């Protein structure tokens, strides 16, 4: 029998993932949304729009009857299950906003629940609330009116206090009316394990924002504290498992792993620093002193509200019930440790480019902790490696041309430390880059056509030299920068300073003077602005300088320029910085600058495909 579910918070960070997973069940979902048209567009862009399962009902959590039209209200009252995962994720909201969203919201949702239970019986109420809520199965049977100001819960922060009181209220109502309630307490939620894509940047993102600015010189709490994390796909799987219980009973489920399985704050910040390519803090400072410093003006400097430290904990939590439901190994197999660097790089990317949207023609995956964008298609994939002063998304137009002309899949890589990929600390820069090639090769057992532009071409040359490629693989090099016309030694600090402080006009002048582009009209729209924004990220700035240092090194120039090879090379003859690498193989000329794959993707694809068997 099809189960009807009222889902509140279905357009949020947790909710969208939940919809995706519930959609595989025999269900009909009433999705409470503020705007039906915006919600439909959101789910279409996410690829989660299941029109036969989803019914969008316009309303408002903060209004009586959830602000629903009478017809929608009657439909909603046919629900068998209510899942409440709604409310803002903003620790700085006012007391009035917090009361409206959480306490009033809890009241109006509970009224709907009571109406359903009296009429037909509510099978299950599922509420998602943060793991720091002080209420559980043992202490929530207390006769307190949560709407009276006298009960302050000894928590000064409006966000936390009202959220936790809402938790208590919904437990009270469930017991009073007689329906089972499952309260699910997740820790800080990050993106799914397949990608690490974390659109909710106000959680872990507060630490990322501070560290990327060099404003996290200490370790709050030291090794005794931790910031528990859970992936939203793991959380959604757990909610679905609870949803499918045959005879649900009222329980609290705390989704916090055992201490020995979790990262302490020192370890978390070390991984964060490494992923962002910055120096890690080592000196610990007590939480109370840290709060005092933040309350004394430190919050304005670091961007970290003092109350956000409440998400750090030195407590142990009972997760026995979770293990009973999911199995004893669940916390280990779903640990965010497995892909945390990708989460951090994703948050950093979102802070760097707050309005950047991913082209829906590409699906994003993680392969060996680097981000790879993939199209659909049949046959051997084209695998593209970008150069410096660019990332994988800059090669999307070329990738689309290759896909449309051949029908074959296209994979575009964000190199470590650039785009959405975390920096990877290795003994040498090339170790991480070659490891990326190795991971990709393991995914394409029948071979692939590798295409490297600029620095990406150097990666493929190095992999070829070390015999990574197989007979079924082929390679095209676009503008391999192996022979500089003029070599100038500039210290790394000067390079870093020059990039970080360069104006839009100076960057454009540099692009034309070096022949990245032949004329200003060939520079893609928003390219210069994107490059300038990129250097607000320490990860991208430091990685760019390090990779540039490596590509300019004497040893690598000798490796790339001396031996006679037989690569297919396409060369833009308006490049003013590099000479044609005639030793590397047959060269086809195009009348464009160094960045011709960005400025002329159609022409580039045409020349690449001249020698490709389709």
Regions found by a protein language model. Give the residues of each.
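Flexible "cap/lid" loop of the alpha/beta hydrolase fold
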Residues: 465, 473-502
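Amphipathic terminal alpha-helices
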Residues: 316-366, 611
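Active-site Tyr-X1-5-Lys
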Residues: 154-182
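Active-site loop/oxyanion-hole signature of alpha/beta-hydrolase fold enzymes
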Residues: 417-451
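Conserved Rossmann-fold NAD(P)-dependent oxidoreductase catalytic core, especially the SDR/UDP-sugar
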Residues: 81-84, 93, 104-158
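Mid/C-terminal beta-alpha module of Rossmann-like enzyme folds, strongest
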Residues: 241-305, 347-356
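N-terminal Rossmann NAD(P)H-binding glycine-rich loop of SDR-like oxidoreductase domains
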Residues: 5-25
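NAD(P)H-binding glycine-rich loop region in Rossmannoid oxidoreductase-like domains
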Residues: 47-105
């Amino acid at each position: 029998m099809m189960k009807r579910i009222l889902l509140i918070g279905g357009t949020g960070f947790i909710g969208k993932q939940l919809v995706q997973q519930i959609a595989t069940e025999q269900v009909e979902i009433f999705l409470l949304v503020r705007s039906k048209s915006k919600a439909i567009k959101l789910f279409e862009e996410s690829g989660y729009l299941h029109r036969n399962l989803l019914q969008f009902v316009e309303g408002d959590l903060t209004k009586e009857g959830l602000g629903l039209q009478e017809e929608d209200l009657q439909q909603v009252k046919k629900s068998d299950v209510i899942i409440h995962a709604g409310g803002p994720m903003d620790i700085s909201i006012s007391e009035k906003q917090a009361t409206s969203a959480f306490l009033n919201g809890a009241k109006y949702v509970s009224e709907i629940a009571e109406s359903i239970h009296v009429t037909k019986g509510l099978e299950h109420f599922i509420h998602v609330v943060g793991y720091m809520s002080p209420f559980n199965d043992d202490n929530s049977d207390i006769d307190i009116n949560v709407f009276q100001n006298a009960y302050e819960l000894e928590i000064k922060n409006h966000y936390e206090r009202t959220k936790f009181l809402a938790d208590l209220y919904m437990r009270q109502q469930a017991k009073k009316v007689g329906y089972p309630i499952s309260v699910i307490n997740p820790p800080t939620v990050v993106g799914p394990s397949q990608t690490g894509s974390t659109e909710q940047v106000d959680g872990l993102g507060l630490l990322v924002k501070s560290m990327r600015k060099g404003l996290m010189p200490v370790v709050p709490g030291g090794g005794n504290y931790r910031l528990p994390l859970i992936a939203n796909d793991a959380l959604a799987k757990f909610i679905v498992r609870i949803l499918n219980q045959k005879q649900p009973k009222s329980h609290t489920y705390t989704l916090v792993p055992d201490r020995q399985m979790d990262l302490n704050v020192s370890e978390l910040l070390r991984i964060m620093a490494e992923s962002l390519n910055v120096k890690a803090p080592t000196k610990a400072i007590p939480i109370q002193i840290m709060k005092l410093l933040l309350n004394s003006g430190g919050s304005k400097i670091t961007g970290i509200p003092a109350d956000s430290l409440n998400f750090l904990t030195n407590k142990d939590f009972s997760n026995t019930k979770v293990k009973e439901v999911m199995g004893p190994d669940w916390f280990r197999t779903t640990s965010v440790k497995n892909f945390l660097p990708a989460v951090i790089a994703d948050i950093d990317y979102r802070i760097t480019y707050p309005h950047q949207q991913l082209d829906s023609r590409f699906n994003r995956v993680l392969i060996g902790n680097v981000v790879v964008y993939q199209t659909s298609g049949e046959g051997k994939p084209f695998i593209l490696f970008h150069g410096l002063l660019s990332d994988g998304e800059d090669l999307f137009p070329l990738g689309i041309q290759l896909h449309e002309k051949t029908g074959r899949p296209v994979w575009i890589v964000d190199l470590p430390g650039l785009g959405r990929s975390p920096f990877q600390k290795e003994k040498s820069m090339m170790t991480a880059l070659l490891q990326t090639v190795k991971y990709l090769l393991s995914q394409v057992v029948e071979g692939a056509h590798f295409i490297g532009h600029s620095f990406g071409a150097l990666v493929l040359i190095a992999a070829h030299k070390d015999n990574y490629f197989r007979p079924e693989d082929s390679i095209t090099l676009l503008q391999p920068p192996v022979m500089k016309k003029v070599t100038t030694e500039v210290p790394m600090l000067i390079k870093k300073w020059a990039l970080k402080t360069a104006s839009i006009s100076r960057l454009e002048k540099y692009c034309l003077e070096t022949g990245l582009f032949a004329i200003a009209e060939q520079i893609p729209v928003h390219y210069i602005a994107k490059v300038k924004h990129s250097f607000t990220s320490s990860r991208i700035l430091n990685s760019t300088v390090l990779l540039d240092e490596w590509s300019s090194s004497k040893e690598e120039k000798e490796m790339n320029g001396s031996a006679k090879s037989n690569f297919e090379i396409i060369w833009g003859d308006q490049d003013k910085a590099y000479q044609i690498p005639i030793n590397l193989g047959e060269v086809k000329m195009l009348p464009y600058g160094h960045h011709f794959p960005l400025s002329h993707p159609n022409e580039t694809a045409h020349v690449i495909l001249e020698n490709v068997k389709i």
